[in-house]
């Protein structure tokens, strides 16, 4: 007796007859590159028996689904190893995440690097046992009995995917299932509440995983719940995939902006000031100034009106905008101002609550509303380097990329509904051109919309009709750009959908940069209007946008993108003059004055260090032009260029040297000068 299935693979389809007991392992078992399968579009284990008429497609280990399955299987192996080492541990959840996985544990002693090493050894032994992952459907009653000593699992049973972030890997789906890890002799080595799917056996994980770090966590992500310990790992489709990832991590560590910020004397985060707040040193402040100066100039060229607003405001403004109460958790607590009391302490004059500014849009609305507006003024674009403050939990602040105090290149455009599509497209093109100015050219778009679940719509304001119009407008504009568009359901701001530009840096990591949001709510809340051509008063549409995201975050990303070796036009110090000996100090000092008078950022190293050390120091500081002067140079009125790649161009007369450096600065090139390209830029 047989059944008919259709196998889809590598772009081809083939219908074939197979036995009624045929599983995915029978079809793909000899191919270790296949870790699971899709049956009628659903991800399932290879051990699953097929049904008549099934549409079957293999899941390759290197695919996104395949890697997620490998990583989730690795979490089970890790949790088994943890439970071997700590039998009384309470198991939390263990989902896959980008590039890896984690598992949360309660009732466990503090994890250390030595513990991670021991756990990896145990995981390798488990993998060597070639334990099978066996799916078992159970009832809620049976599951509670089996997992009676696991309080977090008991809490998850019956939730069917609701509750903790990542819990869907435990109990999502239509059935309650447990996965057993079964040894060759049939003995169950370990089990976990899980919906799967998993790789067929632990041998599929051989030489593909590593444990990476540990941290504190809270059950269900809520600080009111138990504190747990989270262990992270990574897993890949092959030994080579793991090695490549580990190399990327090493490169990312080398480029870490926090490390480079200290080494290059750009910025610091003094404990005396507090987490999430940065101090820019002279070189870092110059880098910041250069970025802001360029962005401001580009906005002026594009028809934006420069404005400025204060950094504190009465709380009522944020109630009008709707940020209170929707945004309250991410704002600093209010300050009570102007309260007066008599000698007995009785309040004689009520104070008012003031807030640090968390966003600029409410104040820009007040500028729009300050006088009557005509349709002839639209689109009206306001732009500000606004300084904002948001209360990020101390555990999530991260260098310059997640801060409590930051500056936004923030703009708000007021336009008619008819103008909105064209204005959005124009601004997206503007975003991309600014990012390209800084050497960021690899990007895609992400469209963030509100939750479709009616129960979760409460955190969003506005009518369904307005949301649909706004979302459709952004979607259509994004598609017209020809760029890749990735959906982000639930990621919208409370007042409207958002498009963000996701940028890939020099080592392939993705960063959110520019954003534009369609807002139909704030014009209503602030009673904004303009006089239309027919004499009626109409509500404008409001477009929020930021090109860099935040200046600080952009500096962090740019520092890592260039590994601290900024292009000539952005380098805080463009030239360092190094005399071969003390006898040439006056010569290089005089030339430094010439360069400085041309606006070139120059330093001289007149220290008592030996010449070789001076060169090493300049290279370590990533100065793009090291100019060396010795006897022959001084006699010829010249200098020698030493460049970042180690190449050298000797005997460049001073006038030509000035022209070369000035040209590299003014042309805003983002590549490094080489011996071959050094002079060519003058003739571009």
Swiss-Prot record:
It comes from the Bacteria. The keyword Protein biosynthesis applies. It catalyses: tRNA(Thr) + L-threonine + ATP = L-threonyl-tRNA(Thr) + AMP + diphosphate + H(+). Gene3D superfamilies: 3.30.54.20, Anticodon-binding domain, Bira Bifunctional Protein, Domain 2, Threonyl-trna Synthetase, Chain A, domain 2. InterPro entries: aa-tRNA-synt_IIb, aa-tRNA-synth_II, aa-tRNA-synth_II/BPL/LPL, Anticodon-bd, Anticodon-bd_dom_sf, TGS, Thr-tRNA-ligase_IIa, Thr/Ala-tRNA-synth_IIc_edit. It holds the Pfam family tRNA_SAD. Its EC number is 6.1.1.3. Residues 256-567 are annotated as: Catalytic. CDD domains: TGS_ThrRS, ThrRS_anticodon, ThrRS_core. Keywords: Aminoacyl-tRNA synthetase, ATP-binding, Cytoplasm, Ligase, Metal-binding, Nucleotide-binding, Protein biosynthesis, RNA-binding, tRNA-binding, Zinc. It is found in: Cytoplasm. Its cofactor is Zn(2+). PANTHER family: THREONINE--TRNA LIGASE, CHLOROPLASTIC_MITOCHONDRIAL 2, THREONINE-TRNA LIGASE. Homodimer. Belongs to the class-II aminoacyl-tRNA synthetase family. This is Threonine--tRNA ligase.
